[in-house]
């Protein structure tokens, strides 16, 4: 059976369901695929297909995630759903499933609950740009005033975490009734898909962003100069363009005099490609793995930042014991480890394996970074945590 060719006729958007346990995230995911497959084609996914989420590894961490896909008239969506609360936290912090927007599921019977708040906060920290709300189980609430109250609470909560609570679309629905084929509730799923289409803008593709290549290796080719290799993370590099080498040492400028891939010379390298970039007048010893090649002025080196971190539990192969302030592991950014020290929040004595925590990290060398960069925490090459840069400090 040959693999189906991926059709690129529609823009591709990544979304996911977030919200409190048992509020109906997986049922909604199933309902969306079912209702949209009737209208636009595609596969319907049953609840248990989605609930038995396969394990994946991201940055050395095992996460259970289900991926489904569906179409609207104008877009193709890839949608992620996680079975457990811990999987959500790991997913959002490691960026295993980057979201262009999220569907926050809140049961009208309960209103916002602790994990509702936690997922919104995490969404803010890790840069989920847009949230659309699905008020679920509305078939079980007869009282219009109660629904309005729950809606108001959700809007307040979103506003509290700097999302535009007042203008956020909220759909009142019942995932279960829609799944059972009740036309009145199926329409609510179509309303939701319409908001996904209109409220979540198309993301800027990585190729349209400023050029960045994390350096994996450096060679010197006699008679030609120095070549750095790596996978282009974003943007395009053209022969003759000026680039900066950023991180670890002082930033230097140089010119790209050649791009090659699979031993063939190219005029340019693009996001996603593994390339060698030839640099003018740069010595082999001036460059090392862990630096980045970037469009001048687009990224700067930093040593201190606020982060949101998930610490692996013992069962996940993490530490067996807690750590305290002054903990000094290695922080793995893109292609290299850098030692750094940890400051914990005032009220926190120690961090237990399995916790997620906000911490300030100070590195011994500067690394090219901006808000949203992901990293792993390692001890002697073993991953013990994962994190994201929330705010660069210096």
UniProtKB/Swiss-Prot annotation:
Keywords: Cytoplasm, Elongation factor, GTP-binding, Hydrolase, Magnesium, Metal-binding, Nucleotide-binding, Protein biosynthesis. It catalyses: GTP + H2O = GDP + phosphate + H(+). Signal peptide: none annotated. Mg(2+) binds at residue 26. Residues 19-26 are annotated as: G1. Residues 10-204 form the tr-type G domain. GO terms for cellular component: cytosol. PROSITE patterns: G_TR_1, G_TR_2. Residues 136-139 are annotated as: G4. It is an enzyme of class 3 (hydrolase). One of its GO terms (molecular function) is GTPase activity. CDD domains: EF_Tu, EFTU_II, EFTU_III. Belongs to the TRAFAC class translation factor GTPase superfamily. Classic translation factor GTPase family. EF-Tu/EF-1A subfamily. Monomer. This is Elongation factor Tu. The lineage of its organism: Bacteria, Pseudomonadati, Pseudomonadota, Gammaproteobacteria, Enterobacterales. The gene is tuf.
């Amino acid at each position: 059976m040959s693999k189906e060719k991926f059709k690129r006729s529609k823009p591709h958007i990544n979304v996911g369901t977030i919200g409190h346990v048992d509020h109906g995230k997986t049922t909604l995911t199933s309902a969306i695929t079912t209702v949209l497959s009737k209208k636009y084609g595609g596969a319907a996914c049953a609840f248990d297909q989605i609930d038995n989420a396969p394990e994946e590894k991201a940055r050395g961490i095992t996460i259970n995630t289900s991926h489904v896909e569906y179409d609207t008239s104008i877009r193709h969506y890839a949608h992620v759903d996680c079975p457990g609360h811990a999987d959500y936290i790991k997913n959002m912090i490691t960026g295993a499933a980057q979201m262009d927007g999220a569907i926050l599921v809140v049961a009208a019977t309960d209103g916002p609950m602790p994990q509702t708040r936690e997922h919104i906060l995490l969404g803010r920290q890790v840069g989920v740009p847009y949230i659309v709300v699905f008020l679920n189980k509305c078939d079980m609430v007869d009282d219009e005033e109660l629904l309005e109250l729950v809606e108001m609470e959700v809007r307040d909560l979103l506003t509290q975490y700097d999302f535009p609570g007042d203008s956020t679309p909220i759909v009142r629905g019942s995932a279960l009734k829609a799944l059972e084929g009740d036309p009145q509730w199926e329409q609510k799923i179509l309303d939701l898909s319409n908001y996904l289409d209109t409220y979540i803008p198309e993301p800027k593709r990585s190729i349209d962003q400023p050029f960045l290549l994390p350096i994996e290796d450096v060679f010197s080719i006699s008679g030609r100069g120095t070549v750095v290799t790596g996978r282009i993370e974003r943007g395009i590099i053209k022969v003759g363009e000026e680039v900066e080498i950023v991180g670890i040492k002082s930033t230097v400028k140089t010119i790209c005099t050649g791009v090659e891939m699979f031993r063939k010379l190219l005029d340019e390298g693009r996001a996603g490609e593994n390339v060698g970039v030839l640099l003018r007048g740069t010595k082999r010893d001036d460059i090392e793995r862990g630096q980045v090649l970037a469009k001048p002025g687009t990224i700067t080196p930093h040593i201190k930042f606020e982060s949101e971190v998930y610490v692996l539990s013992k069962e996940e192969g993490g530490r067996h014991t807690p750590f305290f302030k002054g903990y000094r592991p290695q922080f793995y950014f893109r292609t290299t480890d850098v030692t750094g020290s940890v400051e914990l929040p005032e009220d926190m004595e120690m961090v237990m394996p399995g916790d997620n925590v906000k911490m300030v990290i100070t590195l011994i060398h500067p690394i090219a970074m901006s808000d949203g960069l992901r990293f792993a925490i390692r001890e002697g090459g073993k991953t013990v945590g994962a994190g994201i840069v929330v705010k660069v400090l210096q």
